[in-house]
Curated annotation (Swiss-Prot):
Protein's name in the database: Ergosterol biosynthetic protein 28 homolog
Organism listed in the record: Homo sapiens (Human)
Family label: Belongs to the ERG28 family.
Gene that encodes it: ERG28
Membrane topology: Multi-pass membrane protein
InterPro entries reported in the protein's UniProt record: Erg28 (IPR005352)
């Protein structure tokens, strides 16, 4: 396996663990969301919205962790890429369309993580394409 894919796998595990922490925080205390993320319109944040956000974050976390375990599963790889694209779209729309988020570190951090992850996963696609060919050559 290429060094890049190993780094990408480590990155996915790290992001997954952080997301697990965010999930727990969303279930434990919904003020986390309006104090850190949705600071533009905190009155729209309630317990139900926080738990929904927590489940969405948990699902993304599980998908990313599974991709790190089985990085050569192309379907799982593409689904994982979509988790980052959806997160990027969500936070950008909350920031620029709905005005529920302000450009604070609480929003900029997930935007940067999603952006770097998308970039890394797009680069990783090239390594996934090359690797199966090299495996077949070794067998022959």
């Amino acid at each position: 396996m290429s060094r890049f894919l190993n780094v990408l796998r480590s990155w996915l595990v790290m992001v997954s663990i952080i997301a697990m922490g965010n999930t727990l925080q969303s279930f434990r205390d919904h003020t986390f969301l309006y104090e850190k993320l949705y600071t533009g319109k905190p009155n729209l944040v309630n317990g139900l919205q926080a738990r929904t956000f927590g489940i969405w974050t948990l699902l993304s976390s599980v998908i990313r962790c599974l991709c790190a375990i089985d990085i050569h599963n192309k379907t799982l790889y593409h689904i994982t890429l979509w988790t980052f694209l959806l997160a990027l779209g969500h936070f950008l729309s909350e920031l620029f369309v709905y005005g529920t988020a302000a450009p604070t570190i609480g929003v900029l951090a997930p935007l940067m993580v999603a952006s770097f992850s998308i970039l890394g996963m797009l680069v990783g696609l090239r390594y996934l394409e090359v690797e199966p060919v090299s495996r077949q050559k070794k067998r022959n």
